[in-house]
Amino acid sequence: MSPSYEDLLKKAYTNITEPTEFEDRFTVPTARAFIEGKTTVLENFAEIASTLRREQDHLMKHLLGELGTAGKVEGTRAVFSGKFEQEQINTIIKGYVDDYVICSECGKPDTRLVKTERVLTLKCDACGGHRPVRKRKAIVDPSAASKPTEGAIMDVTPQFLSKRGDGVVKIDRYTMYVANAKPGQTVKIKITRIAGTIIFTERVD
């Protein structure tokens, strides 16, 4: 006997995942960072880790790796050696959320990191999905090589502006800053320094 319309409707409603309280109020705090001498201070580090429901050590390790620097947690703050823009840190945190927080199946943040047999897995409490944690590759800018090197000269086209007014180019996992360049404007630059995933340049045209 085939199931009735009412039975099918009931089953469909059962499979619908209701929004959780965590999902309803999930908003990643904007990083509040400032330069202090030769260091950069992320003053709301603890708040960000708490909102993401991730261990501070795990988030800090990711930030240090992406910035390519040393640092430490001081109370509710994180302190990094070197000078980094607030926008750079926000970009890295967004990548962390995509890789280690958001479920790739339902797009919800109700997840946990679970390590089984040396494999770190992201498990979703909302839909039951799970996946091995892997860094997602950013969209590669076809106008540039995927592995930039210091001293390289290339043509790039900024995609948007930083708060300081510099042009910003995303190349794979790298963020490049170009002075005096507007979005959509192709310019020739030389890579002067690479710090982690941040590329510093100078104009050569």
UniProtKB/Swiss-Prot annotation:
Residues 147-205 form the TRAM domain. SUPFAM superfamilies: Nucleic acid-binding proteins, Translation initiation factor 2 beta, aIF2beta, N-terminal domain, Zinc-binding domain of translation initiation factor 2 beta. Gene3D superfamilies: 3.30.30.170, Nucleic acid-binding proteins. Signal peptide: none annotated. Heterotrimer composed of an alpha, a beta and a gamma chain. Belongs to the eIF-2-beta/eIF-5 family. eIF-2 functions in the early steps of protein synthesis by forming a ternary complex with GTP and initiator tRNA. This is Translation initiation factor 2 subunit beta. It comes from Methanoculleus marisnigri (strain ATCC 35101 / DSM 1498 / JR1).
